[in-house]
């Protein structure tokens, strides 16, 4: 073990010594190479190395007073080739580029509302005037009446009485105010002429739909 360690130590020392000897020489060689390159490139070019500019004519050289032949013809030809500016054409071109005004929409007319028809209330029907039946005084002597019928329907009694009175007959009921469900007699008269009452039985039947009987009148 000791011999191996010693061998390694000796080898390491030899390598370090070689590095110390060889590295300075390498570094000096590189420095010299860089110095040679700097020396090869001159900082300021020599006078003979610069390219001399072409010989320019002197500023004081006199220019020709007359243009060369053919120059005037070329100028005139160029003027003729140039298009002439017509004032009308210029004005037309200017008008072409003027922006067109935006179309203005006409105002929409307001819808006219039709007048609402006035709804007139229908006139109330006028009640027909009932014919005035003259109340004849009951005869003082013997009198007669026509009994048309006896009904329990109070509405039907009132309907028949209205028709007969509208035709001009003298009509009354017993009892005087019809009561629903109770018997009510319909009587026409009284009249002193029995024959007259008998002659009216046909018309009374047409108006009321009832067959009447002539009988003696007894005042209540």
Swiss-Prot record:
The chain crosses the membrane at residues 9-29. InterPro entries: Cell_div_SPOR-domain, DedD, SPOR-like_dom, SPOR-like_sf. Keywords: Cell cycle, Cell division, Cell inner membrane, Cell membrane, Membrane, Transmembrane, Transmembrane helix. It comes from the Bacteria. Residues 46-84, 97-137 are annotated as: Disordered. Residues 57-70 have a biased composition (Low complexity). This is Cell division protein DedD. It comes from Escherichia coli (strain K12).
């Amino acid at each position: 073990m000791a011999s191996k360690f010693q061998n390694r130590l000796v080898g390491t020392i030899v390598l370090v010594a070689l590095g110390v000897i060889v590295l300075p020489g390498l570094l000096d060689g590189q420095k010299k190479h860089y110095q040679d390159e700097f020396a090869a490139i001159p900082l300021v070019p020599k006078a003979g190395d610069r390219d001399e500019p072409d010989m320019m004519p002197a500023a004081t050289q006199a220019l020709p007073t007359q243009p060369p032949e053919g120059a005037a013809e070329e100028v005139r030809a160029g003027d003729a080739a140039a298009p002439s500016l017509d004032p009308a054409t210029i004005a037309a071109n200017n008008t072409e580029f003027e922006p067109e005004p935006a179309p203005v929409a006409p105002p929409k007319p307001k819808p006219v509302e039709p007048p609402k028809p006035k709804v007139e209330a229908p006139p109330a029907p006028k009640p027909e005037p009932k014919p005035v039946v003259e109340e004849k005084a009951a005869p003082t002597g013997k009198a007669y009446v026509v009994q048309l019928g006896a009904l329990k329907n109070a509405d039907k009694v009132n309907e028949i009485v209205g028709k007969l009175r509208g035709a001009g007959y003298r009509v009354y009921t017993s009892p005087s105010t019809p009561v629903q469900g109770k018997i009510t007699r319909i009587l026409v008269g009284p009249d002193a002429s029995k024959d007259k009452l008998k002659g009216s039985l046909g018309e009374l039947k047409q108006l009321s739909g009832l067959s009447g009987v002539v009988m003696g009148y007894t005042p209540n």
